[in-house]
Amino acid sequence: YVTVTNNRRKQNLIIKKLKNGWGKPSQRKYSGEDYECISHYFKRNEDENSIDDITWNDLGMDAVFCMMNNTNSSAGQEYLYKMLRCPNADIQSLKKLDKLASDFDKNAAKRLDIQKIFVWIGRAKHISISDYCDVVVGLEKKSNVLHYASMLFILAAVIFTCTISPVLGIWLCIAAIAFSIITYYKYKAAVDRYFICVNHIVKLLMGAKKITALNIDFLGEYNDKLNNISEELSDITKRSWLLETGNVDGSIAEILLDYLRMLTHVDLIKFNNLIKLFNDKEDY
């Protein structure tokens, strides 16, 4: 009950903040590390038409970006920064963008639905998603043999306890659980930083599905693109609940899932399988 009440209160505060913040300068404060990470996507896609650092600083564009950044997600803020550093002078593209902004301004309810999805996707602290996406795609898939072995060890210990020797079986169960937890944290520590990016990619894809499910009429062209991408990458979001959500709410379900992950390594198995999928779908 307490968790449900706190989550509802948190959602109400988010909605209030989104409504009050529309059309107003962002009040968010940035650390030097956070701001540096935001610029990485632009630096990886810089071209001859980009605004150079001297001109950018002379125009005070850092302050402009900070005031505009109500994106509420890592991918959104990195792309906004890139848009400002690589201005598009094509009149048709600008008219299209202006119409999109006007449509959202006129449709407060639909706008709020989209904003809530962006908040749900969220920001990854102190890292650049674009950096880690490139790293994750280049990772080599690790074997899941040890993870499956830890599950079999626990299963064998339980069967031994129930059918052969309860006393000895209990000690085997303790040993199996200890082995599973120790190996879990050992392997999890090695890939923990990549988990953040993988979770974010999964949430981006799930967010795309949520946006298309809203069926907003003036987003027809974008919905078609998102649907195509979601279909091509649908295997990535399957059984995504096995991964950590990143939203630690203290709920009983999340606590039980944490224990399940430690004992069965299902999130590590899912992670290794996702690495192969990312490499296969690198073009997307």
Model-flagged regions — what are they?
Residues 1-284:
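Alpha-helical bundle segments enriched in helix-capping/polar residues
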